[in-house]
Curated annotation (Swiss-Prot):
Residues 122-302 form the Integrase catalytic domain. This is Transposase for insertion sequences IS1326/IS1353. It comes from the Bacteria. PANTHER family: INTEGRASE PROTEIN (PTHR35004:SF7), TRANSPOSASE RV3428C-RELATED (PTHR35004). NCBIfam families: transpos_IS21. The lineage of its organism: Bacteria, Pseudomonadati, Pseudomonadota, Gammaproteobacteria, Pseudomonadales. Required for the transposition of the insertion element. Gene3D superfamilies: Homeodomain-like, Ribonuclease H-like superfamily/Ribonuclease H. Residues 6-68 form the HTH IS21-type domain. The keyword RNA-binding does not apply. Disulfide bonds: none annotated. Belongs to the transposase IS21/IS408/IS1162 family. It comes from Pseudomonas aeruginosa. Residues 19-40 bind DNA.
Length: 507
């Protein structure tokens, strides 16, 4: 077998210098048949036959390849090393060296790295969207410091496909009610609604994925889409390029927003900061295709958005049973309802930031939704002492240690500490608290504060002060029209009775 240099010399001597095959054979030391074969084949680079010899490792290569693939998926602490694999191969009959196993492992690793670098790369068509045509949505996870703690947050991200204007809103959880709330706030910031929304197959919208474009969409999500009058389009599974703008926005936001973000006192403060920061970035960033800023492109697109309707009632409803202690359980926490609904089934409407209890077609209670460090704070009870007044009137002794009454207003607490030292004071205090069922609570508190200022408060004193505070002013005199006025108005003169009496006596 000759090398490239000799083949090049043979071709040059024959085709350029005109040397005969005999002469070329003499110069190169090759046989005339060999020279003739390469000149007739017209190849410029010699082809070497593939090696067909079987190495000692060849029968064991499938097994070793399987072991390497399995161990690669494990954590580093749990992986077997090559020395252990070599011993197992020897036990199976391998007679080669450990170095040969290491060389094969290096080749396998290089091959896997090359596959990882080249996999997923394909050919795509650039997309272009008209003004007001579509927005893209996606969830992401990021961290922020809230009230001095590092908190993991679920970020709802929206981006207008034409202008590239984007909005972010943070939540503690990624649930249906958060998704609905995020849409309303995003549409408010954009000042309108595009014709179409592009989503992946997120669980907060899609219950199950069928063949092709077939989806079983969540009913509440469908209701929201119908309310806001846009069309929801879902991407193919594992096809992030179909909404590449928002996918890139997720990556860019970590650099532009979350790195170097300040500390926040609450989630509400964080969302206010996110809104202002996003709007500021619209003016700073250039549009990737248009010769203008994102803010300028958004100004052109905003006029094509549909006007906002009223907000969608963004709740998810569940049926709950009230306990005998007038509590409803949700996400490990407890919330109070009026005592008249104890041991009954009610409707719990779950919003992004509050819980509303309803029964018999009306709202019966409302509480802020409890959250902790990135997740629902569990094991807490949120009372409203008003809910227990009807029970307290029957059991006044429960006032002393009743958990719902631990957070009464300060004026009530101070009055309670005074009255409970007197005989029958617990019942008097219960009757004072029950006044809020029939009077404005602010007026009752004012009466209690005035009674405390006098130094010796009592139930009668509070009732007297409340009566004065709530007493209606005397009605204003009604003006009499001229047509109803008397020309000679009667006068109240009691002396006329004396004159009549004297006339009677004289008779």
């Amino acid at each position: 077998m000759i090398n490239v240099a000799i083949l090049s010399a043979i071709r040059r001597w024959h085709f350029r210098d005109g040397a005969s095959i005999r002469e070329i054979a003499r110069r190169s030391g090759l046989s005339r048949n060999t020279v003739r074969k390469y000149l007739q084949s017209k190849v410029v680079e010699p082809q070497y036959p593939a090696r067909d010899s079987v190495g000692k490792l060849s029968p064991f290569e499938p097994k070793l390849r399987q072991w390497l693939s399995t161990e690669h998926k494990k954590t580093k602490k749990l992986r077997r090393n090559l020395r252990s694999m070599y011993r197992d191969l020897v036990a199976l009959g391998f007679t080669g060296s450990y170095d040969r196993v290491c060389a094969f492992a290096r080749q396998w690793k290089d091959s896997e790295q090359f596959k990882a670098q080249t996999s997923g790369k394909g050919c795509f068509i650039p997309l272009r969207f008209a003004c007001g045509e579509a927005f893209q949505f996606d969830w992401s996870e990021d961290f922020a410091r809230i009230a001095g703690k590092q908190v993991k947050l679920q970020i709802a991200q929206f981006k207008l496909a034409h202008s590239r204007a984007f909005v972010l809103r943070a939540y503690y959880q990624q649930k249906h009610e958060m998704l609905f709330d995020a849409h309303w706030h995003a549409f408010q910031i954009f000042g309108g609604i595009p014709k179409r929304g592009i989503y992946d197959n997120m669980k907060t919208a899609v219950d199950s994925v069928g063949r092709g474009k077939e989806r079983r969409v969540n009913q509440r999500f469908t209701a929201m889409v119908s309310h806001y009058l846009f069309d929801a389009q879902f991407c193919n599974p594992a096809s992030g390029w179909e909404k590449g703008q928002i996918e890139k926005n997720v990556q860019d936001s970590r650099q532009r927003l979350w790195q170097g973000a300040p500390d926040f006192q609450s989630l509400a403060d964080l969302n206010v900061w996110l809104e202002h920061r996003c709007k500021a970035l619209w003016s700073e960033l250039r549009h990737p295709e248009l010769d203008q800023t994102v803010q300028e492109a958004f100004a052109d697109e905003q006029g094509e958005l549909m006007a906002l309707p009223n907000a969608f009632d963004a709740f998810v409803e569940q049926t709950k049973r009230v306990t005998s202690t007038c509590l409803v359980h949700h996400e490990g926490n407890r919330y109070s309802v009026p005592a008249s609904y104890a041991n009954r089934a009610i409707s719990l409407r779950i919003y992004a930031d509050k819980l509303v209890m309803a029964a018999e077609g009306q709202h019966i209670a409302e509480h802020p939704r409890l959250f902790g460090s990135g997740h629902a704070r569990r094991g807490h009870t949120q009372y409203d002492w008003h809910h227990y007044l009807s029970v307290l009137q029957k059991k006044p002794g429960a006032l002393r240690n009743g958990a719902p009454f631990a957070e009464l207003p300060p004026a009530f607490k101070k009055l309670q500490s005074i009255l409970l030292q007197r005989p029958g004071g617990d019942r008097d205090m219960v009757e004072i608290l029950a006044l809020v069922l029939h009077h404005d609570e602010g007026a009752v508190l004012s009466a209690v504060e005035l009674a405390l200022e006098c130094g010796k408060p009592s139930k009668e004193h509070v009732l007297n002060l409340l009566g004065r505070l709530t007493e209606e002013p005397p009605p204003k005199p009604i003006p009499i029209p001229k047509g109803l006025r008397l020309t000679l108005e009667p006068q109240a003169n009691v002396n006329r009775y004396d004159s009549l009496r004297r006339a009677h006596d004289a008779a």
